[in-house]
Amino acid sequence: MKVLSSLKSAKSRHPDCQIVRRRGKLFVICKSNPRFKARQR
């Protein structure tokens, strides 16, 4: 999982990527390609 200051580029890396808010943090999850997971500081 990458830790990024901005998730805009992480969201557009794959069509299946979606942004989710969990525990007050923003996450990018990707079911079909899990290596594109990311979290915002």
UniProtKB/Swiss-Prot annotation:
Ribonucleoprotein found in the keyword field: yes
Q: Name one GO cellular component term.
A: ribosome
The answer to keyword Ribonucleoprotein applying to this record is yes
Which Gene Ontology BP terms does the record give? Answer: translation
Cited Pfam families = Ribosomal_L36
- Which molecular function GO terms apply here? structural constituent of ribosome
Q: Which residues form a coiled coil?
A: none
Its keywords, alphabetically, are: Ribonucleoprotein, Ribosomal protein
Q: Which SUPFAM superfamilies match?
A: Ribosomal protein L36
PANTHER family recorded for this chain? 50S RIBOSOMAL PROTEIN L36 2, LARGE RIBOSOMAL SUBUNIT PROTEIN BL36B
Matching HAMAP family: Ribosomal_bL36 (MF_00251)
Recorded family membership = Belongs to the bacterial ribosomal protein bL36 family.
Protein name as it appears in the record: Large ribosomal subunit protein bL36
Give the organism the record lists.
Answer: Aeromonas hydrophila subsp. hydrophila (strain ATCC 7966 / DSM 30187 / BCRC 13018 / CCUG 14551 / JCM 1027 / KCTC 2358 / NCIMB 9240 / NCTC 8049)
